[in-house]
Amino acid sequence: ARRTLFRYAAAGVATSLVSPRLLAQEKAIEALQSITRDVTPIGKAERADRLARAQKMMQAQGIDALLVEPGASLIYYSGIRWWRSERLTALVIPASGTPLAVCPFFEKRSIDESLAIPAEVRVWQEHESPYAPIADYLKARGLDKGRIGIEETVRYFAVDGLKAALPAATLVKDPVTRAIRMRKTAAEIALMQKAADVTMGAYRWTHPQVKAGMTPADIGALMSAATSALGGKGEFNLILLGEAAAYPHGSGKPQSVRAGEVVLMDCGCTVEDYQSDISRTFVYGAAPTAQQRKVWDEVAQGQQVAIRAAKLGVAAGTVDDAVRTYYEKLGYGPGYKPPGLSHRTGHGIGMEGHEPVNLVHGETTK
């Protein structure tokens, strides 16, 4: 934590802010202790259950296999943490039986090391087609003329290559992965809660450290240091000051903390692959004006409207409708027109900061 704080300070904090203030911050952050040492990562039994649920759903929907590229879904199913490049690394999940992992020959040991499920691993050399091992695997199982589900983030060149290798197969949208990932288990919820606890702890530490003249980068450095000290992996720190707080994702104009102005912080972290995404708003160095308090109270009440509207069996879009109706009665909008709610009411979260389902007009998922 100490090294993190100094590194960010050296990169972004003005010299006039560093000396006594940074030393005080260093001392304060040393008092923070990790709160994630006792967390339980997703284990083999949970991943086995994920595969079993996926295969059961595939059989019910007539999907013979799924293709998954590196990213959250690959980690979700297999534990493989990998990056995307022009060299294909992928997981193929059959409707029954053992999955296949495909990777470049020289990466096999790394894939073996990170693989958290029973799976066959096949490789391809630099001069070979990476789709040949997949085609051979599916042909051996009589699936080369089947329906292959393509996970929604798979890149086009991978789809195109698979299509060429399996001309008789039918490539379709994966109807399984999103549906399974949307339903969080108790273990997943516990990790998400811990990530939220880390972010809230970082907020509580950072808030009193904010001083006049600080920039968004300065405040972000404090949040990053606190998040790391508390045992989280920082994902993002969006700090909006003054007028920029009116922009959902900020402004490129220079900003600094000034008394009486709004500080809006939108920050999140990861704990064992699961994320938090929490915003907090305050007025620095002065009591809020009547207008600032009025708008803050209206937004807080809008959140309560959303909570009351979000019930089991209710379409997600109706939550957005309820909140938008409330704001319009106050004179905001209409619709997305500012001043008012210029974006959807909310989004899902899990291994990614934005996941289905969205709280947005027209969303029928219940």
Which positions does each model-derived feature cover?
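Active-site neighborhoods and metal-handling regions in enzymes and metal-associated proteins
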Residues: 4-366
